[in-house]
Amino acid sequence: MALTPIPSTFTSLFNFSDHSPYPSPSLHYLLPGSSPSFSLQLSALSRTPIYFEALKVLSRSKCFAKSPTTAEDFVGDYESLNVSDDDDGSDSNSSDGDNGGGRDDSKKIDSSSSSSSSDSTSLGIREPVYEVVEVKATGAISTRKINRRQLLKSSGLRPRDIRSVDPSLFMTNSVPSLLVREHAILLNLGSLRAIAMRDRVLIFDYNRRGGRAFVDTLMPRLNPRSMNGGPSMPFELEAVESALISRIQRLEQRLMDIEPRVQALLEVLPNRLTADILEELRISKQRLVELGSRAGALRQMLLDLLEDPHEIRRICIMGRNCTLRRGDDDLECTLPSDKLIAEEEEEEIEMLLENYLQRCESCHGQAERLLDSAKEMEDSIAVNLSSRRLEVSRFELLLQVGTFCVAVGALIAGIFGMNLRSYLEEQASAFWLTTGGIIIGAAVAFFLMYSYLSRRKIF
């Protein structure tokens, strides 16, 4: 319920001036105990009457009495009052012109608030920008920068799909993956991260070895005819095959570099045990472990893809007016020719994946065999070192037994060396008898201890 302010209550607070040079009335705010009064021209009130709600005025008057107020606060308060007054005027039976002015003011305030909220959101969250290499189906290569929103809009992907190829998540997304979506295929093959679409492919981290190898493999294949003279495959399949070729060739090249070194070490190590050779064996073993893990991860990815016919069929229907039936994943196309071509491509894709799976398994198996040979050589070296360590321990024990026997003889000699009269020094033969007894006793004690240790199989 809107109430008109009582003159006795609000005369000291609000005073309308009739002598203003402006066509619209001016509103003066007079506060007790504050700075001199100031006036604020309100042009929006030229045709709209002011209605104050009693609760709002009372609460606002309390706030005025408690704290000092600035001109900005009055402006904000008046805007809120103006919006509420316009709402009240629209609910009551006011004129059409008054309602139109209130709606315009409220729309302006709402638009300004929405724009400010969007600006604050954009300032709070920084949208990532990717620098990619774009390879088109025609063979044109260009480097461009694209933000996340544009990338999602152009490829038809979702934000969670980008995480598999995001270069900033390289450490967390190191497992190879091939994700098939409606309009794009996402490739994550170690250092190669790309998005293959119908007419182009976007390559992230193109300066890395995997990106350069992928571009070098893809460019010769972008021609009207394939290498065997038959019709070329769709561009996205060419991109997938080029990615697999570049990745497997890199694994095979690493295997060819490591294999001769390991074979040479296996021939030398049984006879030569030096620190340099052992260190080279350790480094070669570490490289074999890394190569085997990468080949095994790629092999597992290809196996999972071959065991899921739904993903293969999704690759085949990209860019065609075809859908997959939910019950049995059967192809449903508007044109019979599209269905026939999709079924033929499905067989080609399966054969293609099986071919690269065999190459990957061969590389993985050879790396595992070399790694097993290196581990066996390490076991042989450990046994050899253990036998030598045992020989050294036996020799040390033999020296300790001899030292014990000699120490017993030295004890007897020390006893006779004391300045006590034993009457043996008066006889000339006593020296020779004592010396002979010490030597013979030490030898007998040594052989007795040696025979005891031999019976206990310590020697």
From Swiss-Prot:
GO terms for molecular function: magnesium ion transmembrane transporter activity. It comes from Arabidopsis thaliana. Residues 111-122 have a biased composition (Low complexity). Belongs to the CorA metal ion transporter (MIT) (TC 1.A.35.5) family. GO terms for cellular component: chloroplast; chloroplast envelope; chloroplast membrane; plastid. The keyword Acetylation does not apply. Expressed in the green part of the plant. Preferentially expressed in the spongy mesophyll cells and stomata of young leaves but also detected in cotyledons and at the base of the leaf petioles. Residues 101-110 have a biased composition (Basic and acidic residues). High-affinity magnesium transporter that mediates the influx of magnesium in chloroplast. This is Magnesium transporter MRS2-11, chloroplastic. Has the ability to complement a mutant in yeast lacking magnesium transport capability. Keywords: Chloroplast, Ion transport, Magnesium, Membrane, Plastid, Transit peptide, Transmembrane, Transmembrane helix, Transport. The chain crosses the membrane at residues 397-417, 430-450. It is a multi-pass membrane protein. Residues 1-62 form a transit peptide.
